Curated annotation (Swiss-Prot):
EC number(s) given by UniProt: 4.4.1.21
GO biological process: quorum sensing
Functional description taken from the UniProt entry: Involved in the synthesis of autoinducer 2 (AI-2) which is secreted by bacteria and is used to communicate both the cell density and the metabolic potential of the environment. The regulation of gene expression in response to changes in cell density is called quorum sensing. Catalyzes the transformation of S-ribosylhomocysteine (RHC) to homocysteine (HC) and 4,5-dihydroxy-2,3-pentadione (DPD).
SUPFAM superfamilies for the chain: LuxS/MPP-like metallohydrolase (SSF63411)
Top-level EC class as recorded in UniProt: lyase
Name of the featured protein: S-ribosylhomocysteine lyase
Lineage summary: Bacteria, Pseudomonadati, Pseudomonadota, Gammaproteobacteria, Pasteurellales
Length: 169
């Protein structure tokens, strides 16, 4: 099985909150697709609660689009990481990590200011959500407040390259 790019970076050296360009590819038609690692907490040190990350998924998806989509950028998907330390965001275009960090910060402010109670969580019903009872706005707001406590940084692949001796054969 091929070694995926996300397993070629040293998770013990990742900072959070931080943006990392996880992958860039060009489609056969010439479009650029960029995948960003949006790391909310430090791997193996902290973890986002299941209910909190699920609620963040609902909030983050819309607010990031509000702040990042443009004539040259269109978000395809924002999905929680299985390790529950952040989200992957795939998009058409190639915004800078700094632009993504700015949009991320603005979307976090929106999550606090525009969603004061659970009735305001988008798509929170059995028809649009596969686990609509698995939410916590309190946990999501705690995640947001923790992100906003410090500037959102940039994790660079060259700084996180995993020593080949540590890679599983």
């Amino acid at each position: 099985m091929p070694l995926l790019d996300s397993f070629k970076v040293d998770h013990t050296r990742m900072n959070a909150p931080a943006v990392r360009v996880a992958k860039t590819m060009t489609t056969p038609k010439g479009d650029t697709i960029t995948v960003f690692d949006l790391r909310f907490v430090r791997p193996n040190i902290e973890i986002l609660s299941p209910r909190g990350i699920h609620t963040m998924e609902h909030l983050f998806a819309g607010f990031m689009r509000d702040h990042l989509n443009s004539d040259t950028v269109e978000i395809i998907d924002i999905s929680p990481m299985g390790c529950r330390t952040g989200f992957y965001m795939s998009l058409i275009g190639s915004p800078s990590a700094e632009e993504v960090a700015k949009a991320w910060e603005a979307s976090m402010r929106d999550a606090l200011e525009k969603v004061p109670d659970e009735t305001k969580i988008p798509e929170l019903n059995e028809f649009q959500c596969g686990s609509y009872k698995e939410h916590s706005l309190a946990d999501a707001h705690e995640i947001v407040r923790n992100v906003l406590k410090q500037p959102i940084g940039i994790n660079r692949n060259k700084d996180l390259a995993l020593d080949e001796k540590l890679l599983n054969p």
